[in-house]
Amino acid sequence: MTLHAYLGRAGTGKSTKMLTEIKQKMKADPLGDPIILIAPTQSTFQLEQAFVNDPELNGSLRTEVLHFERLSHRIFQEVGSYSEQKLSKAATEMMIYNIVQEQQKYLKLYQSQAKYYGFSEKLTEQIQDFKKYAVTPEHLEHFIADKNMQTRTKNKLEDIALIYREFEQRIQNEFITGEDSLQYFIDCMPKSEWLKRADIYIDGFHNFSTIEYLIIKGLIKYAKSVTIILTTDGNHDQFSLFRKPSEVLRHIEEIANELNISIERQYFNQLYRFNNQDLKHLEQEFDALQINRVACQGHINILESATMREEINEIARRIIVDIRDKQLRYQDIAILYRDESYAYLFDSILPLYNIPYNIDTKRSMTHHPVMEMIRSLIEVIQSNWQVNPMLRLLKTDVLTASYLKSAYLVDLLENFVLERGIYGKRWLDDELFNVEHFSKMGRKAHKLTEDERNTFEQVVKLKKDVIDKILHFEKQMSQAETVKDFATAFYESMEYFELPNQLMTERDELDLNGNHEKAEEIDQIWNGLIQILDDLVLVFGDEPMSMERFLEVFDIGLEQLEFVMIPQTLDQVSIGTMDLAKVDNKQHVYLVGMNDGTMPQPVTASSLITDEEKKYFEQQANVELSPTSDILQMDEAFVCYVAMTRAKGDVTFSYSLMGSSGDDKEISPFLNQIQSLFNQLEITNIPQYHEVNPLSLMQHAKQTKITLFEALRAWLYDEIVADSWLDAYQVIRDSDHLNQGLDYLMSALTFDNETVKLGETLSKDLYGKEINASVSRFEGYQQCPFKHYASHGLKLNERTKYELQNFDLGDIFHSVLKYISERINGDFKQLDLKKIRQLTNEALEEILPKVQFNLLNSSAYYRYLSRRIGAIVETTLSALKYQGTYSKFMPKHFETSFRRKPRTNDELIAQTLTTTQGIPINIRGQIDRIDTYTKNDTSFVNIIDYKSSEGSATLDLTKVYYGMQMQMMTYMDIVLQNKQRLGLTDIVKPGGLLYFHVHEPRIKFKSWSDIDEDKLEQDLIKKFKLSGLVNADQTVIDALDIRLEPKFTSDIVPVGLNKDGSLSKRGSQVADEATIYKFIQHNKENFIETASNIMDGHTEVAPLKYKQKLPCAFCSYQSVCHVDGMIDSKRYRTVDETINPIEAIQNININDEFGGEQ
């Protein structure tokens, strides 16, 4: 029973001395007494390789490299193990979650948190922490008895003690945790003859838990010898750099005193690891109180990058230089990090440079398609077949892998489901999924082609197969009563899905293709799933449980599954965290993310028990818990020290100025400290360095091409670019080995969104030999030719969703107003409040069920929206009544359609126009309302258009002039052409072109006293004032509002009179009859010009910018045209917005059917 302690700073040869001793003993007596090297889990593989690869040893039967848990198993093999079943991490988590749910009503502080998955995880960690530090429920109960304790702390500890005690009772005599197995190991030590003959070495640790100290105590007591290696100078000062390992030494000294043995200390002072003076000086002076500056010889570098991505790209380039120029191997290099954001960057960037690497971290299995399928399947049952988990389940492609183009079929199914609002048990309604229903998907109904029918039949078959599997699963689970029943039902369901065969086939294919890591993942997924089922049966067995609770507990278990990947090769870069990674004697170590906030890292308490509660508990209960935040904060310098002393050749520190979320970052104060130790140790700004040394960017062929692209793009924009980039382009272009993909990059370099003008034949194939179109189609072309091409040429459709769109709301208002107008023959004056409500209810009952497959009755929200629509309609009718009371114009026709060949007598005829290519233009559409007034055998007509959007309820004559707003002039033209079909007199003249804004008006008041009910109603009515353009003819003016008189401005039409009875400029929007006719004829010419441009094949990405706004803001096709202000701004079209449109139209000569030149 001897105890040795090898003490010294990093790189002084402590571990080398240990390995040399072990090697000498093994050479002297290969089959002698056992030698046990205890190391952290992360180090065991590396140390085993050291013995295996030693040419003088070639392995050993005498020496074993173990961590504490594996050592315990070694002892159990000799003396016998415990009879209890050992709980896995997942089994422990599931058991504690179930206990928390059962005990929820008894909890005092955590009752509301108990339902969340994360709470049981925190509670499990706290209980495991207690066990590591030998704190029992009895300790907690004794501590809780303290009358001076705060109520919140008392309630917290009572809750934890309740769950902890219940957990201990559940596992008593039946199960054992990993921490308890270590306690059993301690009890077994005296029985082990093997241990009594063993020489023990403990290396690689900087701190231990209470249970681990007890193990060490047992080893010292029963083993032949124990040697512990610690990185410390022996200084017990709590503010020393080596506080943490010195604390370990203090504990070992206490153990030695208890056992009445002395510690044979051996101090190591000579530095052996470092190959140069830079690293020696860095190690010796890092914690020095008085700085001794020396010249840096180039073995320490500090890199500053703009972003984290740029930082890792630079590290990758420098690794290539290490391998190529310095003749290092990948296994000679290590990367250490602390910010978890870097893990993703390693995976995304290092493969681009063909750098083999292994990250010493475990990845969760939850994002694997198989796990996502299972968790989505669980959620489908839990949520009663809601659409989101169903779609996630389908998109995993696990249950649909047997279908060709399954992803495409699932995409079509998703379109249909979102359009029809399929949820809940509607998934089971075969009638809803009739193939004929797919003919209407995202478009007007049309007859399915044979190919479309075959495709949609496959969609329906796929959906039915998946539903059958889910129903089978649901039925099997619903018949289960105990946990064992549930586990059995789940496994049998997976077999029914043929999941095992599917996974094994996929694994074999991956292995055959050399993708061994992915193949290994498949194995671990299936084994992990079976392990969770086994754990459930082990822990709960025949215990009754509801299906809901079982699925919750099962999901908790799935959350704990992690991939444990074995390195695929020995020659690879080692990547790990600064806190846990065990890398030693690497030629080059890169420490990335050296920012303030990461190194040092603010340490905050994340456990259920706060730092203050820990300290109070330790004092009162005389126990030791895990270190508090302030203690851990003191050890940050030691973490940095250990990380940077792992190298023996070079150390590169790097940091970025911007975080992963775009936040500003500062340099680590440790780097400032390191920089102060050396003269001429400058921070290298990476962008500036590359600007001066462009060749440093050319380390990898593929990545050089990408950087070359950026350089050439800068050159095209007249920026100064180094000649070496032009040389690099020529080399790559002329090399058959390197020029793959170069043409693609060059085409991207000159990409400018320029479209190809369609030929005459293709234009006719796309648009037909005649143009049959609505007014909005021509307006859409004027906004942007490409928008028209995408919608009417390519016929691209947006995914239709089961939700109310703005245009749906407009259609509802139009339909409701048409229904009511026809019922009352347009006589709004006769309406009273009772009649308004009655007609509104009738109209809504008739119309709303037809909107989007009865959408407005699908949920409480939409039913509320229906009532809101009803309220808007009632207010609108009140406004129409008010307007009708003071107008001589009478509404006569509602929702009147027009086209070239009317299908009924009620429809109007639209005159055919002709393009410059001789192609007929047939305009079709629907006029919301036509009001008429007849006097002296002359009929005057008003066009009334209902708008539910305020932005579109305005007639902008500048837009009319330029063909951007064509609707109202077209409607007036159609009405003037159809006087006989409308039953008008021989002489018909325009009255007004007016918009009616259907909306829910709001009135602002400064104070409550301003509110008057009668005035409020009047003000609301005024909010519905018509806007647009009115014929300045006195007969029209008098008929529009019979109240008009001098100094009066109408509140129903845009007309006002001055004091002398003339039309006021401020309150009137009027034009004379000839001007209106000119606008109408000019509108026709805009139709001809627009249609001619369409048939000419214009498809340019050329939006029309008007009043500093682009139509792109609300365009559905941006993802297709990739409009970009930098690329396309030169093609933005503009118009002269300063013109007076009425003066402009009066100054042009127009030939028309109204009487020659005007």
Swiss-Prot record:
Residues at which ATP binds: G8, R9, A10, G11, T12, G13, K14, S15
Keyword RNA-binding: no
SUPFAM superfamilies referenced in this protein's UniProt entry, alphabetically: P-loop containing nucleoside triphosphate hydrolases
Span of domain UvrD-like helicase C-terminal: 269-583
GO cellular component assignments: cytosol; DNA helicase complex
Biological process annotations from GO: double-strand break repair via homologous recombination; recombinational repair
PROSITE patterns: UVRD_HELICASE_ATP_BIND, UVRD_HELICASE_CTER
Miscellaneous comment: Despite having conserved helicase domains, this subunit does not have helicase activity.
Stated name of the protein: ATP-dependent helicase/deoxyribonuclease subunit B
Lineage: Bacteria, Bacillati, Bacillota, Bacilli, Bacillales
Gene that encodes it: addB
